[in-house]
């Protein structure tokens, strides 16, 4: 009797979707046009929501070991806010609109079941807003493309010769960045002109992601191996 050996080698493309949470802590360092000493903690919040996107990669298998490279890009809707601990009439808002992961993988396969770990670079598209707590009026804003690192792990199941599904967890280490916020003039253009720097904040960020994935592997020229 011949038992098929599942082959994880080859190029693959797929889709993913799930949930994310970005933990951000804000410290004001400049307000307005004056250095804040000591740095004043504005507080933290979790920006949560859904993610959906795709991935493309290549894997090669040696005995039970599986190695790979992958690029992933997702749209995101991770939103959160907190009332500032610096001035209570301010609310700090954040949103991640997209992210990308560029990783290497190492895993071990038990026939059509693959467990893997991954690590590499991460990038996020971040938007920040300051609003009046009572009215929601926008008084300043900032944005950035932030680079950091990612580690993750996943469990994948091959349910057909070229198809597999997986569940994956990733943690993004996005570090601490300083951002200057542009004034809208809502709190008084005489204090800070429209378009001027209203304040500067140091913002720390980490992101956690849980996604379900489906992949199609092309496996060009790779026949199914059998064993007796």
Per-region residue spans from a language model:
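Gram-negative outer-membrane beta-barrel domains
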Residues: 1-228
């Amino acid at each position: 009797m011949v038992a098929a050996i599942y082959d994880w080698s080859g190029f693959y493309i797929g889709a993913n979707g799930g949930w994310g949470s970005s933990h951000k802590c804000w410290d004001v360092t400049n307000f307005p046009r004056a250095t804040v000493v000591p740095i004043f903690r504005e507080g933290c919040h979790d920006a949560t929501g859904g993610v959906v996107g795709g991935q493309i990669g290549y894997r090669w298998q040696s005995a039970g070991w599986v190695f790979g490279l992958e690029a992933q890009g997702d749209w995101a809707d991770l939103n959160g806010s907190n009332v500032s601990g610096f001035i209570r009439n301010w609310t700090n808002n954040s949103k991640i609109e997209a992210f990308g992961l560029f990783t290497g993988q190492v895993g071990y396969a038990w026939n059509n079941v693959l467990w893997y770990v991954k690590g590499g670079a991460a990038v996020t598209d971040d938007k920040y807003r300051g609003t009046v707590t009572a009215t929601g009026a926008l008084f300043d804003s900032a944005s950035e493309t932030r680079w950091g690192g990612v580690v993750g792990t996943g469990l994948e199941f091959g349910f057909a010769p070229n198809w597999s599904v997986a569940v994956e967890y990733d943690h993004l280490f996005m570090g601490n960045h300083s951002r200057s916020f542009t004034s809208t003039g809502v709190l008084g253009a005489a204090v800070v002109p429209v378009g001027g720097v209203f304040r500067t904040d140091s913002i720390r960020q980490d992101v956690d992601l849980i996604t379900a994935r489906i992949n199609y592997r092309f496996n060009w020229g790779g026949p199914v191996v059998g064993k007796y």
